[in-house]
Structures are given as C-alpha cells and as structure tokens.
Amino acid sequence: VRVSLFVSGCRHHCKGCFNSETWDFHYGVPFTEETQDKILELLKPGYIQGFTLLGGEPFEPENQQVLVHLLKKIRETYPQKDIWCYSGYLLDKDMQPGGAVYTEYTKEMLKQIDVLIDGEFVEAKKDLTLIFRGSSNQRIMCLKDGEFAGMWQK
C-alpha cells in the first residue's frame, strides 16, 4: 500500500493520458503545509510501503521547488520507506544540466527518489500487461544518490 500525490501541470499532453485534467497548472487545490502534514501522517503506518509522485508532471520546473522540499521531508521522517516518481521527461536527457527541465532543484529532487519511471505515455505502445507503466517505451529505473543505478527488477 502506498500514499500518492498527483501534481498539477503537464506540458506533454500525451494522447490517451489517464489523467488529462492534471495538465492544467491550476487544477485541484494549492499545496500547503497542511497538505504536507497530511501526507506525512498518511505515511506513518507500518503497512505503508512508500510514497508515489505522479501527475501531471512532477518535473515541470514550476513544480520542483515545492516537491523537493516535500520529498526531503518524507526521506528525513521515514528513511525506511521508498519514493517512486513518474515523469514523462527522460532522466538521461531532460533532467541533466542543460536539459529541458533541469533547474537548481532537479538534482536534489532526484537524490530523494528510489525508483523513477520515465518517458511519455505513447498510446501506440500501450501494453496492459506491463507492470507499473502504461507503454513499452517507459523505463523503470532504480536511482542511487540521484544517478541511474540499474533497471528495476520485480
């Protein structure tokens, strides 16, 4: 069992997106300290394995400053719980210095994440038999200190 946060704002606009209402950066309710406190409270029980960050697009530059603070707080409070993140951006291209979404917060955000599922959803590559991803182009990667550490194995 996991706790999940769906963020608002996404520029990918993938055809067939399961959550297209979150493309709008103003969708939903503002993220507040109370929201963070609620997430931390929900993560407390031992049966909660970890936290998943989805969207929308967590790595949109507008989202990174708030999210890095949240992820660091989760990591500090619950070091035994894992953090997964879904992003349509590519780790080895867009999230590197000079990449499309690289900001002063990107590296620190990546350092908090254990498993990153990257790549846009591609409807033509949709495969319902895949676990934890919607299309075959998406990769499930383990991260260590913000760097690629191998492909995730079930």
Regions from the language model: what does each represent?
Residues V1-H13:
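N-terminal pre-triad scaffold of radical SAM enzymes
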Residues N19-G99, E104, E108-M109:
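Conserved Radical SAM active-site core
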Residues L70-R75, K126-K154:
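P-loop/Walker A phosphate-binding loop and immediately adjacent motor/lid segment at beta-alpha junctions
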Residues D114:
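Receiver (REC) domain switch/active-site residues of two-component response regulators
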